[in-house]
């Protein structure tokens, strides 16, 4: 891991800079021994308020970078999700920290972190190294964030703090990790390079700021030392974490970083969890549910080590609220996306104009496909008995999709 960190440092020195918007999201990683089919499963709900417009592109490979599927929200620096040709997948959750200083070089980095993972990482472990290198070289300029990264063999959580401090933990193969918008990494052992990585002064810096007092606090706990207290006590964060824990573990009180689920996790389970919405459940407790009014994309990454990357790695996308949209598979081997799914003809143009072409999206692109999905959300949120029947019918259709898909895979692989 240390060698990989060093090898990426020079490459990262030429990267550009950008600014942050932190909104609610939710993510899950299930290790390959915890899943029904032996895949690593990573799931993510992207939640962003305001006028959002999803575009989907396939960025071609170059001599220096990999091919990747890119789910883009114009103008957003912390919202896009990616899966590259090796199945390396990345998404993130805003996790506010208590850091009020933060050492930055050249203005720090933000959006470039996820794009660099998509372009250069051939494994999740390399993705961890890239993120760590960027944070240590430039500094992270947001308050705090946890990147979730996975490949067909393992998944990781990489938590960064404003400035140059970071830590990463591997999700055990037989366990499931869930994360709302607060840090979930607790006790850290940087000597265990198989399961942890991070900056060397992580503990010493916390001591120097008075965030960790060894004589009274016991073992060092990253989340307790670095997290914003408001994020840890947020009703929405706690509610979404409880909902996931209740589903996977049969309990509502979040415990360790990850735990063994009460049964093997399937693709369908991930769809169910991302779709938990109080409109359907009738749950009136305080705080946002996992699926909520700000959910603009739900993605599930099914990463199977026993099939070649092109067919074995699939990004399942529900374009909007997953409680009322169907998940559609995107294979890692595709070389281009349907033309109507992007506002530009090429991914290269979209990349060049990601920040500059981000205002008045509905006005400038009135015929964009995404607005039809947004209209469907509004229509589907009528809590009438008739509308609930529509939900049931859509769910039944979606329930059959993984069965047909798995039958196809078994036939040819």
Located regions from the model:
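Secondary-structure boundary elements
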Residues: 120-129, 133-142, 263, 305-308
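A contiguous strand-loop segment
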Residues: 21-110, 130-255
